[in-house]
Amino acid sequence: MQPENLPPFLRGVPEITSYDGVKALLKSSALESATHEESIDFGRRTILTIDGEEHFDRRRLEAPMLSRDALKAYERSILVKTIDHCLADVAPGPQGLPECDLSELITRMLLEIGATIVGLDDVETAERSERLREVRDPMMRAFIVEFELEDHEPIIAEGLTAKDAFRDEFVQPSRERRQAEIDALREAGDTAGLEALEGTNLINQMLLHWDDSWDDDMLVRESLLYLIASGHSTSTAITHAVNELSGWFEAHPEEYELRLDADFLMNAAMETLRLHSPTPGILRRAVEPVEIADHDRVVSLQPGDLVSGNIAAASRDESHFGEGWASFNPHREIARTTNRYGAAFGGGTHVCIGRQLVLGNYARGEKEGEYFGVFVRILRRLYEAGIRFPDSFKPQPAHSGHDRFEHFPVVFDDMDAVLSVAR
C-alpha cells in the first residue's frame, strides 16, 4: 500500500524501491525525465528536465561554476561572512536569547551564495535580499508543485506572477549589464577578458555560449533552478540534521563533545540526507523497451510507460544500509560501493550538479582538504552558537509530499561568543 502523503503524480505508477534498482533507473538511457511536467513553465529545458546529448552539453557548459576551485572561492568570500551576519540579525525572543525559525535563517544564508552562483547583481542589502526571497518562495513552491498535496492551480498562478517579477527585477538588469560587458570585450578583441569570465556565474556562462535554440525565457528558468537548488534542499536537510542530532545527543550525551567535529558532522549530514531525501521520488518515461531489476522481481517497460523511483525507500534498503536502517546513526558502517547519503543526490548523468556545493570534498569520498561544503559549515556554526530547541518544543512535520517541517523554532545560548570572535 502506498503512503497517504505520496504525491498524486506518483500514485498508481509501478515503483522501483531497491537501492540498486533506483540506481539502474537513474542511469538508464532508455528512460527520460517525467517528473516536472505540471511545472513545465518553470523547468522547461533546464538542466534538471533535459536528457541525452542536450543534457550532457548543458552539464559540461555549467560545470565550471561548481568546480572545486569555484566552490572554495564562494566559501571563502561569501558563505562564512554571510552565515555570521545572518546570525547577527537574529532578534532576541521572550527569554532574551536570540530565537528564530531555523529554516528561514538557513534559507537567508544560502540565498546570497545562490545569487552569486547565478550572477544576480545588487542583492547584498537587506531590502534587496528580502525582496529576492519574496519572489523566490512562490516560484520554489510552483517549481515542485507536483509534490504538493494542496490545490495546484493557485500555487502555479502565484509562481508565475513571482517569475515575472524575478525576471524584471533581478535577471534582466543583471543580464543587460553582463551582456554589455561581454559585447565590449568581443568588440575590443579582448580574449583574455572573455576567458576570465568563464565559469564566474551562470548568467555569464550562458551569455558567453548562447544557444540560438533557447527561447528568451531560458535564462530566467535556469537561474530560477539554481537559486532554488542552492537553498531549498539544503535548508530543509539542515533542519532535519539538527532534529536528528538533538535526539542522538539525548540518547548519547557522551558524544555531545563531537558537535564541532567536521568528520562527525559530515557523517551526520550524509545520514540525514539518506533518511530525509530532498526529493522523495522521481518519475521516468520509457523511450524504448527496458527492464529494471528490483529486489526479486523485474519491471518490464515499453515506450511511453511510466515508472517511479522511490528515493526514500532506496535509501533505506537493508541490503545496503544494514539493520536499523530506519534510524539515525552517524556511525553507520556501509560498503565502500554504497553512497553514505543513499540515493539523495540521484545518479547517472543526472547526479545532482550541486552535490559538491553541499558536501565539499566528501562528495567524492575525499576526507582531506579545507573545503567542507555548505552543510557542515553551517551546521558547525549553529552548534558554536549554542543552538537548541525552545523548552518543551518538538518540531511537527508539514502536510506535504516533501519531508519537511511546518515550523522549526530554535534558540541560541552562545551567540555572543560566536559573533565576538567573528568581529
Q: For the regions a protein language model found, what residue spans apply to each?
A:
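Conserved cytochrome P450 K-helix E-x-x-R motif and the immediately C-terminal K′/meander segment
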Residues: 1, 258-297
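Cytochrome P450 substrate-recognition site 1
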Residues: 2-70, 134-145
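Conserved cytochrome P450 K-helix/beta-meander segment immediately N-terminal to the heme-binding cysteine loop
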Residues: 30, 310-337, 345
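Cytochrome P450 heme-thiolate monooxygenase catalytic core
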Residues: 74-236
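Cytochrome P450 catalytic-core helices
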Residues: 220-224, 231-257, 354-386
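Cytochrome P450 heme-thiolate "Cys pocket" and heme-binding signature region
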Residues: 331-408
